[in-house]
Amino acid sequence: MARLPKPSAVVFVSNVARMTRFYRELASMAVVHEDGDHAVLEVEGFQLVIHALRGAPDPVSGGGGPVHVRRDSYLKVCLPVASIAAARTVAAQLGGAIQPPDKEWLSRERGFRACDGHDPEGNVVQVREAAG
């Protein structure tokens, strides 16, 4: 029986290099493949594809203006991290944000603490640490 490919999600972005760095550093992901149009990042059992938008307008992202956070997106990527607090710092350094500690929530039955945030282009992302 053939092995199934790893589950993955694709995030469409304006700046592939910047967004690859953001996700790579936020969730300690390894770069599996990278070219001018896309990058494939991997963390245990999951791949995230950072793919260039084609023909879409650039969102306001890091040029000093506000980032439009797409809260009602059809997809939210949830990534495992060692520490939500550390992820919050990394996200801020790279132009994104993770909400403050009072917005974190615990899922005892699923074994994690989570907090939402956004990447530098406004895509919603959630970080999850093991519940201790």
Name each region found by the language model.
Residues 1-8, 29-80, 88-118, 129-132:
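Vicinal oxygen chelate
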Residues 19-24, 91, 122:
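Conserved active-site tyrosine of GNAT-family acetyltransferases
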Residues 124-127:
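Short glycine-/small-residue motifs
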Residues 10-12:
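A conserved hydrophobic helix/loop-capping motif in glycosyltransferases and polysaccharide synthases
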